[in-house]
Amino acid sequence: MLSKTHIMFIPFPAQGHMSPMMQFAKRLAWKGVRITIVLPAQIRDSMQITNSLINTECISFDFDKDDGMPYSMQAYMGVVKLKVTNKLSDLLEKQKTNGYPVNLLVVDSLYPSRVEMCHQLGVKGAPFFTHSCAVGAIYYNAHLGKLKIPPEEGLTSVSLPSIPLLGRDDLPIIRTGTFPDLFEHLGNQFSDLDKADWIFFNTFDKLENEEAKWLSSQWPITSIGPLIPSMYLDKQLPNDKGNGINLYKADVGSCIKWLDAKDPGSVVYASFGSVKHNFGDDYMDEVAWGLLHSKYNFIWVVIEPERTKLSSDFLAEAEEKGLIVSWCPQLEVLSHKSIGSFMTHCGWNSTVEALSLGVPMVAVPQQFDQPVNAKYIVDVWQIGVRVPIGEDGVVLRGEVANCIKDVMEGEIGDELRGNALKWKGLAVEAMEKGGSSDKNIDEFISKLVSS
């Protein structure tokens, strides 16, 4: 019966959205569920998919040349939804004809009216959230009009159910850029959750106990994380060390060889995510010199469009202490014995990965949910420090260097490392056989099979 149970995944086509969904898919496949993941053709053709238990199908997201790229987020996602819905109907019929009818569609929460779309296609629907429960609660309260983002002038703190008191700088930052209605779209993630059959969050019960309970009082949410490869956690899935889905090629050999030559706990790993940073030239310069002035060895991921912001003087001085790469295998790096801290933008995936591997953090949040995650890193889980921002919105190199030193040495560093190791143990506990997330996944499968 289980082998006939078929789940189709529809990720949003970005590395930070596809990776956790792939981890969930791999775990379900290992437990005997048939899995198909639907990807844009342009992405599937250029990516590395490394799991033989995962079937793939393609959807084209090409926009008509005459129409161009829709200007508003609602218009853009409306076009995407139309293309997905039209193609999914054919894919579902194909799977049914092949003897593997789809029982459930797991759809990234960013897609509009996901549950409605699934039910119109005659299939159960489950939104998949790639941010924390805390951020979900904040976005939902903003969606209800109980909170404005960006906050009103004069607002210094915000009190919300299940959430610790938030300062103005702890709230999500929405840089609208191309899509001026982006925040409205983020709020609309909650528009049809009351109709969802399941709702998945990449978190675990002990990490966000109160936040998950509050969301559970609103909708049928299920905590299924931390979603990172099994060999870094519970080791139930044999040889599961890779993301399984990668948009970028990392020079694994040179990164690990460089780290192998360094003393245990002596290296700062710095990375600010898989999309273009919002750093101006001044900001980039302060981060760069802050790393150098900390006097610690560092490995820094600087994606290609950003590398031009690094001065020739910095690059020359960094040769002795630093390795600057365009991409690296983050999990392998974070788990390496030489890593002592992680300077991060506080994206949710990076936060969960560092916490699960017991690495304390230097928080440099930029936008979206990142300030909220930084608040939890520093004040709730107590596994990092946050670099203060100057009046002009730019960090100062001296503050960057001092924060690195706080995490890497002394009593503060010892306390942060101890807390990080505690959370690492709890992350493993959640995913090992009989752990909270493992049980949640098993109960979900059982209910799906019997429905």
Curated annotation (Swiss-Prot):
Name recorded for this polypeptide: UDP-glucosyltransferase 74AE2
InterPro entries listed in its UniProt record: UDP_glucos_trans (IPR002213)
SUPFAM superfamilies: UDP-Glycosyltransferase/glycogen phosphorylase
Keywords: Isoprene biosynthesis, Transferase
Keyword Transferase tagged: yes
Tissue expression from the record: Expressed at higher levels in roots than in leaves.
Positions with a binding annotation for an anthocyanidin: 17
A Pfam family recorded for this sequence: UDPGT
Reaction it catalyzes: (20S)-ginsenoside C-K + UDP-alpha-D-glucose = (20S)-ginsenoside F2 + UDP + H(+); (20S)-protopanaxadiol + UDP-alpha-D-glucose = (20S)-ginsenoside Rh2 + UDP + H(+)
GO biological process, one term: terpene biosynthetic process
Domain of life of the organism encoding this protein: Eukaryota
Active-site residues, record numbering mapped to chain: 17, 108
The species this protein was found in: Panax ginseng
Pathway it works in: Secondary metabolite biosynthesis; terpenoid biosynthesis
